[in-house]
Each structure stands twice: as C-alpha cells, then as structure tokens.
C-alpha cells in the first residue's frame, strides 16, 4: 500500500475527497451571502411597496370618481324629472287669476234671475272645463273647509269664533289655493275657527 492510499479514509479515492471538501466550502459561502443583504433586493422590495401603495391610491381615486359620477348622474336625473314635473308651474300661475275671476263671477251672479241663467251656466261650464284641463296636468284645488289648518297649504287671514267648527280648523276659504303634483303653487287664504 502506498502512503496516499493509507491517508485516504476508508476506501475513498483522492478525487472524491477533494469534491467533498469543495462542496463543504460552497455550502459555507451561501450562509455568508445570506447574512449580507443585496442592495438591489432592498431596492426591489422598496419599489414593490411603493407600487402597491400607488395602486391602492389609484383604486381609491377611481372608486371616488365613480361614486361622484353616479351621484352626478342621479342628481341630473332628479333635476330633469323635477323640471318635467313642474314645467307647467309658471303657466298654471298665469291661469290662476283667470280661474279666480270665473269663481268671483259665479259668486256675485244673480242666479235667481232667469235672464242671467244662460250666462251663469256658461261661466260654470267654462270654469269646470278649465279645472278639468289643469287637473289632467296635476293641478289640485285647495278649498276644503272644516279641516285642520295646514301651514303648508293654508294662509290664515283671520280667526273667528265658531260653535260649528272645531278650534284650529278652516272655517271659510277666502281664496282657493292650488297644488301642482303635490307642491303648493298658491296657499289657500282662509279664516280659522277659534274657541269662544
């Protein structure tokens, strides 16, 4: 046996020993490099964090913009709906004096006079047809008596003592009021009953 063969551990060839030692050295090197952080890895991690934050901000901005757009669309639709619903308001306001004049003409007309009967009937029919037309477009008359005073549709002109009507109720309508699609165009001018 040669001296080389004696120094090698149990039947290993010298090349195998060198390869084993070389593997041990390589195994040690990664441990050293794992302790040292590569500045490029740090920069990549930092950039990834910044990217994630920027994406989050962009997502929030997009959601906010979408919500604003939805709100604007909804408001615009409501405004258009209201404009269609109340487009006749100005026209109806112009018609109210005509309707009031026909009402007053009927109040003062001498209905007992047979000579005026055709004229009174003509005024009644004209008033009825005009009210029918405006009702088709959502106009309602406020002229009820013996109902509780509602400041949204009544304007109290005076308070009068009454035994027939409960206190706080409408006793008489001095001038009719009108609503258009539920919105008061003109409040009814009324006298209100008060307790004795």
UniProtKB/Swiss-Prot annotation:
Protein name: Protein GrpE
PANTHER family: GRPE PROTEIN (PTHR21237), GRPE PROTEIN HOMOLOG, MITOCHONDRIAL (PTHR21237:SF23)
Subunit and interaction comment: Homodimer.
Signal peptide: none
Keywords from the UniProt entry: Chaperone, Cytoplasm, Stress response
Entry function: Participates actively in the response to hyperosmotic and heat shock by preventing the aggregation of stress-denatured proteins, in association with DnaK and GrpE. It is the nucleotide exchange factor for DnaK and may function as a thermosensor. Unfolded proteins bind initially to DnaJ; upon interaction with the DnaJ-bound protein, DnaK hydrolyzes its bound ATP, resulting in the formation of a stable complex. GrpE releases ADP from DnaK; ATP binding to DnaK triggers the release of the substrate protein, thus completing the reaction cycle.
Cellular compartments annotated: Cytoplasm
SUPFAM superfamilies associated with the record: Coiled-coil domain of nucleotide exchange factor GrpE, Head domain of nucleotide exchange factor GrpE
Region described as Disordered: 1-41
Gene Ontology biological process terms, A to Z: protein folding
Top-rank lineage group of the source organism: Bacteria
Primary location class: cytoplasm
Stored Pfam families: GrpE (PF01025)
Keyword hit for Chaperone: yes
Presence of keyword Lipoprotein: no
InterPro entries recorded: GrpE (IPR000740), GrpE_coiled_coil (IPR013805), GrpE_head (IPR009012)
Entry's Gene Ontology molecular function annotations: adenyl-nucleotide exchange factor activity; protein homodimerization activity; protein-folding chaperone binding; unfolded protein binding
Gene Ontology cellular component annotations, sorted alphabetically: cytosol
Family of the protein in this entry: Belongs to the GrpE family.
């Amino acid at each position: 046996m040669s001296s080389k063969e004696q120094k090698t551990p149990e039947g290993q060839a010298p090349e195998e020993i060198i390869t084993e030692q070389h593997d041990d050295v390589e195994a040690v090197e990664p441990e050293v490099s794992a302790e040292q952080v590569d500045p490029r890895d740090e920069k990549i991690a930092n950039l990834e964090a910044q990217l994630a934050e920027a994406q989050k901000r962009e997502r929030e901005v997009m959601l906010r913009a979408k919500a604003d757009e939805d709100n604007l669309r909804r408001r615009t639709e409501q405004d258009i709906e209201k404009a269609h619903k109340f487009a006749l308001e100005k026209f109806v306001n112009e018609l109210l004096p005509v309707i009031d004049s026909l009402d007053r003409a009927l109040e003062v007309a001498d209905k007992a006079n047979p000579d005026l009967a055709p004229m009174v009937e003509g005024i009644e029919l004209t008033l009825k047809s005009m009210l029918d037309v405006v009702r088709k477009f959502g106009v309602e008359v406020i002229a009820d008596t013996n109902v509780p005073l509602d400041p949204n549709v009544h304007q109290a002109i005076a308070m009068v003592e009454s035994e027939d009507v409960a206190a706080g109720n409408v006793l008489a309508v001095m001038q009719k009021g009108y609503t258009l699609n539920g919105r008061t165009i003109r409040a009814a001018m009324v006298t209100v009953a008060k307790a004795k």
